[in-house]
């Protein structure tokens, strides 16, 4: 909540019915303040009083801001347009607002900022945070704002700012520039100087170049902020031609500077730019010319002056320029036109019209031309022509070919002998165009620029090794590579003295290398020629042909000359082209090691190929050498749990398969990708129709025995075990279109079409006729990226979490995340928090620019930040956030007691011992209390999970794809449509219960509507939804899922079914066969597993045959186990997962030696009821088993003092043997504080950004909701120069 909203709260309101107050707006009596927030407006409304001083238009759908909408407001001082969809702002928009002092355009879609005024204006505060801004031109933006005090450009896409942007701003005291991908070259020197003069909220960090990444701009040495001096290539007559040698890749656009100001070829006479070459007048002082490059292409908005355009003939808004590209590269050209009626665009190459094809693809209404690969025959003159009924325009430009030369090493490293303790320098120099990059490796392992005693020079040409040891003896390889090839050279280091180092792998001498190369040439040259002919003639008909092509795209000279880039591009192109043509790959032939490069390519060169491609296998491998620590405690990412196979169960690794995947092409495309394809004679049904006809229910039946806590604990456990990583982009890789604006299957978009009879289409609530869906990200090494792992494999998906039940949802799945959650101010081993409840108990800390999933429901009036937790989904719904809060409180409660009992323990020991106890609590509650309930009894659980027989290191605990994507999602069938909120009297609180869709991503309601107690009581004192086959998912999940965050609300059933197809899960019947269950061949056979004939008829109408039923659908409709919540198929998959998760965990709480017998005795006392009693604010009544529902009357619930409590005395002086490395961990812990995002004034809570009056008040105290302030956590002085500046 910002200053404007706070001020508005101070005055009386009347509804918008009088003159000067538009409909849907609220105004004060004099019309000075007008609030049109949340009104669904698409433009500024008419009828606003000319006396208006403050105009608030937050949370609307305004997409264009034009001057005519702002005429007639001569007294307007504050304009708030946050949370709209503004993409276009007309030039000089403030010319009609002579008194405007505050302008907020945050949380919009702006990419380019035009000139805002043509004459001086008294603007004091400008907020542009959280847009998509990539370019700001100082010549217009800030030229007329001498009174500007504050500017916020944070959370945009700005790489650099022009050098004069902040000149002539004498009043500027606050500039927020963080959360931008800064390119730290000479262009940020002015930014650095500015940051030293003004105040800022958070530091701005470099993103590029790599060697400066994560360094704060204001702390970088100025000598490192470099631009390159160009080389003089030639001069003719009155012109110089200069070449920027810094640009090593055509994918990085060159930026030219003259006298430290960027050169713009569209506005400076006499300059001509072609890629990395600039032609300048001879009178130019070339000593003042420098160059650098952007790391991502800055779009055409960089030099576009946007304006409002009415009906008329076509007019170019962006014209493509002449350019040059390297052979084999991808070319993307934008030609953008506006006009009404909408113009049609036609393309010509050398005067000949062409249509979209695989080689030359046209997208986005023909606005975008893509050419891949760009070859000599593609060069020439291109014309973009736009026509409508009112006229025609055309523009012609050239695309030229740049010659490329593969690297040639002219000075290679020489073998050398050196004494122990000495120093050696290997030199490697190569020529090529583009300039080669260098990669050094030692016995197959890549050497970083600085790695211990190894150091690579800045240009990569030298490798220096100091203080040589015997283990450094071996072969060193230098590979020089550019986009068109690579070459390598090897040298041997012999270390004199000490014992002879035994090589782990046999070494190949020069004679053997020559023999291998000769044989390889004989075998490969003829095979390559043959396969190229097959490629040209489209004769690839089976997997073996494809495998031969993969192998023979390797280089002719296997040792001396390795064209790594050619291998990669040729192979990927081959996969893409022939899979697109319909090639079917047999899974049995593809997995696991059937297409190896190693027979013709040295392992060091394979390593180099992987490095150059940028593709790595998830986690960096921990050597697990810290045996003291790893014997006592878990790592955060799961590594070193299994000493024999340390990557088992680790985060950021592929999900495990129970059955081979089913992809339409056998490789990577999901079932349903190709429209109309038949399976067993029938097309697969539209998943939305399955949801509507079979899964959705408007009525629910309460469970007679179980409480809603069963559902909530299941979700909490799931978020400790599984989180499938989805595609990073919402844009189609092929066309660049947003996934929510296309219904075509274009990676990563796999959207679900809506039928004409769909209620969303009929009601016109769907802006686009499909539900948005992005595919899960593929693990590098599968699908398209598999080639750099020396084999072709089918697509696999990644689990971002550890597969162990280890409380990673409390502590995080990596060490960086864990440090974010710790209180490192005090050496007390506690978790961090920012505010407390009225009972003095901690709430979750607020996130601060983290990766928490927080699609905020910003229609609410209390926009606090989201909570931070070990799992990024903690804000997903209110009851989940309350459960997370319980465990933060329990950790800190235990940590305080351990500290009191063991005064000699430091914070690191307290933290890890407490974390170990919390993990054991989760394991005990899950296996002893929760799993027997969902399986329908201990006997059923023992049948499917089995009893614990001890740790088995041969077991892989990794989560299975079927478990994460289908089986464990049975929990969606037991979710109530309402979150109950009950007070101490077990009646509804005054704010009432809350519909589920209103509980999504609304963490502010935890703080403002009763805290966590009502939510927790609503879980253990309300009945679970019964998962009846005819009542599966409630309508809150089918029609209103995350409806505030999406233009088309999601459908959870649709997500589940589509995700299982995306992951290639086989059908329901195949998993029944895997589980040794009877497999239905006909619909009549289904009656043994599904009792309701109507459900069988619906399945038959949707799927045609039983063999087509999706796993999740079949699993939720089959007959349940007696007293259980799922049927035998899901019981098989879930039981297998929990059994392996337990038996393959070296730190399982029941394993001998993990806890002492005395400690185990106490852990067995743990119940979730006790945790709720200890950590709720005022929970004093509860049933002993919170998963059972005793009824709604208060008398059915016993007192907390009657529940058994764990005695922590068993941990007194238990763990004094501290590992030495734990002291290092304390020192490495990042010292971070907790900033409160708000303040307290006269006992009243003021949210972040609110202005307080009278002047000189300070934000000094923590706000304790529902009680007076408790402690001082923040002091913020308000200087006189700040009082008129506002943070929105």
UniProtKB/Swiss-Prot annotation:
The keyword DNA repair does not apply. The active site is at residue 719. InterPro entries: Cys-rich_flank_reg_C (IPR000483), Haem_peroxidase_animal (IPR019791), Haem_peroxidase_sf (IPR010255), Haem_peroxidase_sf_animal (IPR037120), Ig-like_dom (IPR007110), Ig-like_dom_sf (IPR036179), Ig-like_fold (IPR013783), Ig_I-set (IPR013098). It catalyses: L-lysyl-[collagen] + L-methionyl-[collagen] + H2O2 = [collagen]-L-lysyl-N-S-L-methionyl-[collagen] + 2 H2O + H(+); bromide + H2O2 = hypobromite + H2O; L-lysyl-[collagen] + L-methionyl-[collagen] + hypobromite = [collagen]-L-lysyl-N-S-L-methionyl-[collagen] + bromide + H2O + H(+); L-tyrosyl-[protein] + bromide + H2O2 + H(+) = 3-bromo-L-tyrosyl-[protein] + 2 H2O. It is an enzyme of class 1 (oxidoreductase). Residues 17-51 form the LRRNT domain. Heme b binds at residues 718, 876, 972. The record marks 873 as: Transition state stabilizer. The keyword Membrane does not apply. Binds 1 Ca(2+) ion per subunit. Binds 1 heme b (iron(II)-protoporphyrin IX) group covalently per subunit. Its EC number is 1.11.2.-. Residues 1-16 form the signal peptide. Keywords: Calcium, Coiled coil, Disulfide bond, Extracellular matrix, Glycoprotein, Heme, Hydrogen peroxide, Immunoglobulin domain, Iron, Leucine-rich repeat, Metal-binding, Oxidoreductase, Peroxidase, Repeat, Secreted, Signal. Residues 314-400, 407-494 form the Ig-like C2-type domain. Ca(2+) binds at residues 720, 802, 804, 806, 808. This is Peroxidasin homolog. It comes from Caenorhabditis briggsae. The gene is pxn-1.
């Amino acid at each position: 909540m910002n200053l404007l909203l706070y001020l508005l709260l101070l005055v009386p309101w009347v509804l918008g019915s009088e003159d000067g107050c538009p409909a849907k707006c609220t105004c004060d009596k004099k019309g000075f303040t007008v609030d049109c927030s949340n009104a669904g407006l698409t433009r500024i409304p008419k009828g606003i009083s000319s006396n208006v001083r403050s105009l608030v238009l937050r949370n609307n759908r305004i997409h264009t801001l034009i001057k005519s909408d702002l005429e007639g407001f001569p007294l307007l001082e504050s304009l708030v347009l946050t949370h709209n969809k503004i993409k276009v702002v007309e030039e000089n928009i403030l010319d009609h607002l002579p008194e405007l002092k505050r302008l907020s355009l945050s949380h919009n879609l702006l990419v380019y900022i035009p000139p805002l005024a043509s004459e001086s204006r008294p603007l004091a505060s400008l907020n542009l945070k959280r847009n998509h801004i990539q370019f700001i031109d100082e010549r217009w933006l800030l030229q007329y704002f001498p009174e500007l005090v504050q500017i916020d450009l944070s959370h945009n896409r700005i790489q650099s700012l022009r050098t004069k942007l902040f000149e002539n701003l004498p009043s500027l005291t606050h500039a927020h520039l963080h959360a931008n991908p800064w390119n730290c070259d000479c262009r940020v020197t002015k930014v650095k100087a500015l940051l030293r003069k003004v105040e800022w909220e958070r530091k701005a960090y470099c993103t590029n170049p790599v060697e400066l990444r994560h360094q704060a701009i204001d702390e970088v040495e100025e000598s490192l902020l470099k631009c390159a001096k160009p080389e003089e290539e030639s001069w003719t007559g009155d012109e110089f031609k200069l070449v920027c040698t810094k640009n090593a890749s055509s994918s990085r656009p060159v930026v030219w500077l003259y006298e430290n100001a960027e050169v713009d070829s569209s506005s400076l006479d006499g300059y001509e730019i072609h890629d990395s070459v600039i032609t300048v007048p001879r009178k130019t002082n070339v000593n003042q010319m420098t160059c650098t490059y952007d790391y991502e292409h800055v779009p055409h908005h960089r030099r576009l002056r946007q304006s409002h355009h009415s009906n008329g003939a076509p007019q170019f808004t962006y014209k493509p320029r002449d350019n040059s590209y390297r052979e084999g590269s991808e070319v993307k050209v934008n030609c953008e036109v506006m006009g009404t009626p909408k113009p049609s665009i036609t393309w010509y190459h050398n005067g000949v019209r062409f249509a979209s094809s695989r080689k030359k693809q046209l997208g986005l209404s023909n606005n975008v031309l893509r050419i891949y690969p760009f070859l000599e025959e593609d060069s020439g003159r291109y014309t973009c022509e736009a026509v409508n009924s009112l006229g025609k325009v055309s523009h012609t430009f050239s695309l030229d070919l740049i010659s490329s030369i593969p690297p040639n090493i002219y000075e290679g490293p020489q073998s050398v002998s050196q004494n122990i303790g000495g120093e050696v320098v290997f030199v490697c120099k190569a020529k090529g165009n583009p300039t080669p990059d260098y990669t050094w490796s030692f016995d197959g392992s890549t050497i970083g620029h600085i790695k211990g005693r190894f150091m690579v020079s800045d240009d990569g040409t030298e490798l220096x090794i100091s203080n040589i040891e015997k283990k450094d003896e071996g072969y060193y390889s230098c590979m020089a590579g550019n986009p068109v090839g690579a070459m390598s050279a090897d040298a041997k280091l012999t270390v004199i003295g000490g014992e002879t180092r035994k090589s782990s792998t046999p070494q190949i001498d020069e004679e053997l290398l020559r023999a291998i190369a000769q044989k390889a040439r004989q075998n490969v040259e003829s095979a390559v020629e043959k396969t190229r002919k097959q490629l040209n003639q489209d004769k690839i008909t089976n997997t073996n042909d494809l495998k031969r092509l993969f192998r023979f795209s390797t280089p002719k000279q296997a040792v001396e000359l390795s064209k790594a880039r050619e291998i990669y591009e040729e192979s990927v192109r081959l996969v893409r082209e022939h899979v697109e043509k319909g090639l079917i790959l047999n899974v049995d032939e593809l997995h696991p090691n059937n297409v190896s490069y190693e027979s013709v390519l040295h392992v060091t060169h394979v390593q180099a190929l992987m490095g150059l491609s940028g593709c790595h296998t998830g986690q960096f491998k921990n050597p697990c050498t810290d045996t003291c620590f790893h014997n006592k405690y878990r790592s955060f990412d799961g590594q070193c749990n299994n000493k024999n196979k340390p990557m088992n169960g680790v985060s950021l690794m592929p999900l495990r398969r129970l059955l081979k995947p089913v992809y339409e092409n056998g490789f990577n495309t999901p079932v349903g990708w190709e429209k109309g394809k038949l399976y067993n004679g029938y097309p697969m049904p539209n998943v939305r129709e399955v949801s509507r006809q079979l899964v959705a229910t408007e009525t629910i039946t309460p469970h007679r025995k179980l409480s809603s806590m069963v559902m909530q604990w299941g979700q909490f456990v799931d978020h400790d075990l599984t989180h499938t990583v989805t595609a990073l982009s919402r844009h189609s890789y092929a066309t660049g279109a947003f996934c929510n604006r296309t219904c075509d299957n274009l990676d990563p978009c796999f959207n679900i079409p809506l039928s004409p009879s769909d209620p969303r289409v009929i009601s016109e609530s769907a802006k686009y006729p499909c539900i948005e869906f992005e595919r899960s990200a593929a693990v590098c090494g599968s699908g398209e990226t598999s080639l750099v792992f020396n084999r072709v494999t089918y697509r696999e998906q990644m689990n971002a979490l550890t597969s162990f039940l280890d409380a990673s949802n409390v502590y995080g799945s990596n060490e960086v995340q864990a440090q974010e959650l710790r209180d490192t101010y005090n050496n007390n081993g506690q978790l961090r928090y920012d505010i407390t409840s009225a009972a003095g108990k901690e709430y979750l800390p607020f996130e601060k620019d983290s990766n928490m999933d927080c699609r905020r429901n910003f229609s609410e009036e209390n926009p606090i930040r989201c909570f931070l937790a070990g799992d990024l989904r903690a804000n997903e719904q209110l009851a989940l956030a309350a459960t997370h809060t319980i465990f933060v409180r329990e950790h800190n409660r235990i940590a305080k007691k351990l500290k009191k009992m063991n005064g000699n323990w430091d914070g690191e020991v307290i933290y890890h011992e407490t974390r170990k106890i919390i993990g054991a609590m989760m394991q005990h509650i899950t296996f002893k209390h929760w799993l027997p309930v969902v399986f329908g009894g201990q006997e059923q659980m023992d049948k499917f999970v089995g009893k614990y027989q001890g740790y088995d290191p041969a077991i892989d605990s990794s989560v299975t794809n079927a478990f994460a994507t289908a089986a464990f999602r049975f929990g969606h069938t037991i979710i109530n449509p309402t979150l109950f909120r009950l007070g101490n009297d077990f009646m509804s609180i005054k704010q009432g219960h809350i519909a589920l869709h209103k509980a999504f991503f609304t963490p502010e309601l935890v703080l403002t509507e009763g805290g966590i107690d009502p939510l927790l009581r609503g879980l253990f004192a309300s009945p679970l939804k019964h998962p009846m086959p005819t009542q599966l998912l409630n309508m809150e999940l089918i029609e209103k899922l995350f409806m505030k965050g999406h233009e088309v609300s999601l459908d959870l059933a649709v997500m589940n079914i589509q995700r299982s197809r995306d992951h290639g899960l086989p059908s329901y019947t195949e998993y029944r066969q895997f589980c040794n269950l009877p497999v239905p061949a006909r619909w009549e056979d289904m009656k043994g597993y599904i009792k309701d004939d109507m459900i069988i008829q619906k399945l038959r109408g949707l799927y045609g045959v039983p063999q087509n039923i999706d796993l999740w659908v079949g699993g939720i409709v089959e007959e349940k186990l007696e007293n259980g919540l799922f049927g035998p198929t899901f019981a098989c998959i879930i039981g297998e997962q929990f059994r392996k998760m337990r038996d393959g965990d070296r730190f399982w709480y029941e394993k001998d030696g993990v806890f002492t017998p005395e400690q185990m005795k106490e852990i067995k006392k743990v119940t979730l009821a006790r945790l709720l009693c200890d950590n709720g604010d005022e929970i004093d009544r509860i049933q002993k088993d919170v998963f059972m529902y005793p009824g709604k009357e208060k008398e059915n619930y016993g007192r907390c003092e009657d529940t058994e409590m764990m005695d922590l005395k068993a941990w007194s002086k238990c763990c004094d043997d501290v590992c030495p490395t734990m002291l290092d961990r304390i020192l490495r812990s990042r010292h971070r504080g907790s900033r409160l995002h708000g303040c307290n004034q006269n006992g009243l809570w003021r949210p972040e950004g609110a202005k307080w009056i009278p002047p000189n008040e300070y934000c000094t105290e923590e706000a304790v909701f529902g009680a007076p302030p408790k402690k001082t956590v923040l002091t913020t002085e308000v200087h006189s120069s700040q009082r008129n500046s506002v943070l929105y």
